Amino acid sequence: MDVVNSTARAAVTSATAVTAVTGTGDRHPNPLSSAVAAASDVANAHGSSSWLGLFARVVLWLLQFVSMVLYYAIKLATISVPTLLYTLFSTSLTVTMNATTLMLIVAAMIGAISWVVRYRYLNMYSRLPPEPQRKEPDVDLFPDTHEEGIKSGLSNYFDEFLSAIKIFGYLERPVFHELTRSMQTRKLIAGESFNLEEEKGFCLVVDGLVEIFVKSSSYNRRYPHGPYFSPNSEAPSSDDEHPAPGQQRYQLLTEVRNGAPMSSLFSIMSLFTEDVPLRHADEDNSEPGTTTHSGLFPNYPASADFRKSRVRMDSVPNTPQMDASASSSANNLPGQLDRGLPHVPPISLDGTGFSKPQRPVPKRSNTTSAHPDIIARATVDTTVAIIPASAFRRLIKIYPKATAHIVHVILSRFQRVTLATAYNYLGLTNEVLQIERQMLKYTTQQLPNHLRGDALDRLKEKFKREVERMGEEDDVSKGIALHNARAGRRRRSTATLRKEAALQAFSKQRNISSMSGSSLAIPNAGDLVTHLQQSRGGGNRAQSVAFTDGPSPHLDVEREAVSPLAQRTFDPFVTPRSIHVALEKRETLDEDNLFRESILECMFRSIGLTGSGGSNKDADSNQASPRLISFDQRRQKALYTNHAFGFMDGLDGSADGDTESITSAGLSLPASPNPQFLAQEMRDEMEIVFFPKGSVLVEQGERNPGLYYVVDGFLDICTQEDAAASDVVHPTSRTSLHAMDSAQSIRSPQRSPQPFAESMRSGNKVDDAEIKSKPNRRSVALIKPGGLAGYVGTISSYRSFIEVVAKTDVYVGFLPLTSIERIVDRYPIVLLTMAKRLTNLLPRLILHIDFALEWLQVNAGQVIFHEGDESEAIYIVLNGRLRLVEDRKDGGMNVKAEYGQGESIGELEVLTETSRSGTLHAIRDTELVKFPRTLFNSLAQEHPNITIKISKIIASRMRALIDDPSTMLGIKDSSGRSSINKSSTTLNLRTVAVLPVSAGVPVVEFSNRLLSALTEVGAPNGATSLNSAAVLNHLGKHAFNRMGKLKLSQYLADLEEKYGLVIYVADTNVNAPWTQTCVAQADCVLMVGLADGSPEIGEYERFMLGMKSTARKILVLLHQERYSNSGLTRKWLKNRVWINGGHFHVQMTYSPNAVPIHPPAKPSGPTLRERVQILQAEIQKYTSRKVRHSPFYSPDAPFKGDFHRLARRLCGKSVGLVLGGGGARGIAQIGIIRAMQEAGIPIDIVGGTSIGAFIGALYARHADFVPIVNAAKKFSGRMASMWRFALDLTYPSASYTTGHEFNRGIFKAFGNTQIEDFWLDYYCNTTNISKSRAEFHTSGYAWWYVRASMSLAGLLLPLCDEGSMLLDGGYVDNLTVSHMKSLGSDVIFAVDVGALDDNTPQAFGDSLSGMWAFFNRWNPFSSVANPPTLAEIQARLAYVSSVDALERAKTLPGCIYMRPPIEEYGTLDFGKFMEIYGVGYKYGQEFLAKLRERGGVLPIGEEMGGKKGLRRTMAPRRASI
């Protein structure tokens, strides 16, 4: 305590001193001194023993410490510091320093500042956040676990039966019950055989295994003509002997397993068309008492052959007897027919009949079996179900509408399965063309004689004047159509207006007939037309409305009262004074209409429409009944059609778009109409067209535009003889692009024939015009006047196997496909007639192939075969998509190939009898043709020439592998995995789904623009778009329920068969059935998102992932402006590992507000407007005329748009630009790009090497020429600076420079932009010297991989990327054309600017002195070539593989090789920027001009924009007469 007291006293003393200092001159007491005094008093009063005293002392100590601090602070500020400053400033200092020391100090300061700037400011590129390359994701596989041949669920009879009757298409419940209620089953023990010729019905295997055999070599020895025998020849009956199948008499065709039909497509057509006549007799020959077998068919003369055929069919055992009345009615024919007396037709001027008597068509064989020469043997105990023929006959009578639909489905599949396979795959050209040739005898109907004299001459004179008036610039070969003033009004009318017009016409005819009894004839010049009408109606009086025979003056009054466009109300019995009368304009129009009506009548009779049904009173009343006509118009809505504008049929029906059942019409289906009435109704749709000699009316491989009736002249049915051979020997680039990882993975090059497709992909070595001007055609048949061209292809809506060419100047009547399809919908007898004719004309070889081929329908994810399975069949894709995968050793899967429509799988394995090289599964629901190995073996033994076609196919695959080994070796990405060849995944796409990422994306507007771009680009066979409204309008409100599922699938399959590309627009809610349909039907899914929106995963993406779709998925980002911010694309791709098809940037203006994905329901106005726009776009393909005397391309060509770029990608027509390396010589590439842009050539994909990678990246970033010039010029200026090069030198341990200046120059051009943000697809290649391979980079920082691709060894350091060292890509491949081809590019512009090799011969001996070589280099008088230096040897060694790759690139199909004259410029001549740029620009202009002049293939050519459809449709150039 003494210490504390002493301390306190000292503190008091110091505080007193402070108080004295601070309190001087202040009268008021100091608060600090007062506090200290008070604390001291308290401490003294209480002492140290109490707590209060202790606290007071602590406070006293704190106050004393504060006072001491204040004291010293005030002293330092007021006394010490001023004193020190005064002393410092008053002192004199002298520093002595020499210049060396000063320079060293300044140098140190400059070095420090330079270090800060160099490593803290100028190398910002090295401090960018790491963004590694995006790995190409593996394709998700969700294969079905069901084994082949085992059905899901309970494998019972019902499942197997339903699987077998899928071949009939969609069957409603009543139709299904009617077809199966008389079905019988038959048990077969193992080894039991039975003759299918005795089975008059549809047979299918419910349980077990059956082998199908056909008569073999003994038949060929008896009939030595082999497969080329006449189909009408007599065949021996098989009733006399039934040898065992193991003998030589029979060959094994195929094996039929559970759920597969034993009957063929031909058998089904035979069962449905038993009672259909081959040729419908004219009305003049019809007897009033003839009857028909069913309500579907009109009265036709039943011959004795048909009656006997019916007797034989009705006497078949196990056939129900409920058709006794029908058979008895067939037998109770007039006696004179039974006696075979000749029938004398009445005298008439009607010339529609044949001028010479037609001999009856001989029967194919003595039996009417639907299974000729076929027997079956059960391998195991088997259950067979049989639907008798009587069930089919009963179905025709009860449900004729459903029957027509089934026949349509069967006929379509027969064309797609049997005929297409025989023609394209087996090379049976003669057999298929024989059908076309022999069909002419059924489709010939002559015009009336009075239309062949002066009337025909006047018609020719009109066309002659028009041809003379046309200029040389007009292409007459496209055809000149006769002007029809009513055609425009007809096109603008709807189905409802047509119905009202028809009713009005019928009512007027009845009114006239009631007033014409007491009339007088007032002849005038127009009576010629009425005379012709009288001639035409001479044989149709029984079917016409009852007119009186007296002349009528009311006719002329009516003619004056109404418009000339309504000239349907005239008296057909007014006779003219003279036929040689000068016709006025209106009468000329009437004569033209008369020609149209007469041609239509001949057409209708040729296709099976006759007026014989008019003799029936009920039929007459039906024709005149407005209620029934309206009902019939509505009835056609429920039929399946292949309309070009099939989705518009909803406007013809009810307002809600619903349709009635197929079976609702029942027995009310009217008989065949009167051809005259139908011709009057449709005459405005008929065109009379003139084609000069040599014009092509129908091209081989295209869909028939319609029916051509020859009025005068000759048409030649021919085939391109070497078309198939060229496809086999010289496969197109599309074929060579398939991803084949091994020789076992092959595919067929035989697709649907596409004329001139080869020339579009043959590079600049093929003259397209020369190919078109000199086709190698082989004539098949000649169509004379009265004949019909395009009958089979038009009625069946399938591609044409033939080519129709004008043999002479020809005048034809043309009825478009849409009109034909409407007729087929309303009158099913047209389909049945053609089916009957086909069954009568088919050669036996085609029939046997039809029995062996199997039509399969597999579900999405279902496995067709597994890796290592036995190769028992070849598969051909009808529609859908398949993927072949193989297992990797690490447990993953590699995609080997994808197969689309028309491609085949497994030929090599079947021929070599090896096991499958991979697992094949369906990406989506797919239809296949199964070509069994047993059929191939049978054909090889019986007809060895058939196997030549398949042998050529396999040889072409092997040749493609040899010519382009990269397709077999695959492409390695940066991780070393085998990436998926994109060409195989974008090749032959048939369906594309447009799916929004989330609600609010304008997918409807996007799909409309995409469809327009596809139309202009020229998608093969056209493109169409489907949304939910279109499907509901066409199929009704039950389209998406269980009942309509098969109906919807059949409708979608027909659309895929008809169009080259179908776009499914998911414009409904995320859980709607239509959204599920879009995803399930897609070969490729376009995920459309708004670039400015949130990159989070949307609800539609979750829905798609939940469906486990294995289709290709492409991300499409919509931008308001043509620019993408850096890093934006990476944010979208980061969470979407399932995007395995790349991404696209598309500029499309849209409202920033949320756009409802499914707008609320509105009246039919908007829907009608959308459909009218689509209709106009379709018509524009055929009516638009190209502007003459203009270049192929213009700078503002719309083909450079983003939608056109996406359309070319989907169609496999992408244009690639490959830029090679060459240092400063690469500046010439900028000039070539400018020339291409001015020529209007679009560029979709850019790839480059070295300096080409730099130029290509600049162009891909902006997709424009202007921005790249400035950036490239700045970079060239930096590279030309010697000071920068000198400052960048370093000790040459790894390179001569540090690479900083080089990096800085590239970074200033690109910044932190990533390759994903480039507007165009881009890649650059490098050489990975760590792993000794080439690598291609499509993601990551652009400057980084461009720098790596430009890293010249020795001059620059290699770049380290994920542990690997990357150098210049030119060491391996300086012109990456093969990789560009693998990305799916169709046409490739390759610009080579590399240095030329010095091939000077060397002879410096076995040893060489370095001193001699040095002096020899500087000796101007030496005649010995200078030996290469060490650096030159190393450089040549490095580029050895690149030279070989360059030579392969020059000869690659589809590659247009360009090399500007830049040999005089060096690698580092960057200072000559403008000079080199000018050389490239001038060369590009000259090269493209020469290419265009000599007809070289450019990416926008004549085949785009729908020009092919201009020549043969309703819109050839009209004659203004």
Curated annotation (Swiss-Prot):
Broad class of enzyme this protein falls into: hydrolase
Residues at the catalytic site: S1250 (nucleophile), D1368 (proton acceptor)
Protein name: Lysophospholipase NTE1
GO biological process, one term: glycerolipid metabolic process
Annotated region described as Disordered, given as residue ranges: 280-301, 315-372, 738-768
EC number(s) stated in the UniProt entry for this protein: 3.1.1.5
Binding residues annotated for a nucleoside 3',5'-cyclic phosphate 2, in chain numbering: 837-957
Documented activity regulation: Inhibited by organophosphorus esters.
Motif DGA/G mapped to chain: 1368-1370
Lineage of origin: Eukaryota, Fungi, Dikarya, Ascomycota, Pezizomycotina
Domain PNPLA: 1217-1381
InterPro entries linked: Acyl_Trfase/lysoPLipase, cNMP-bd_dom, cNMP-bd_dom_sf, NTE, NTE1_P-loop_dom, PNPLA_dom, RmlC-like_jellyroll
Binding of a nucleoside 3',5'-cyclic phosphate 1, residues: 670-789
Signal peptide boundaries: none
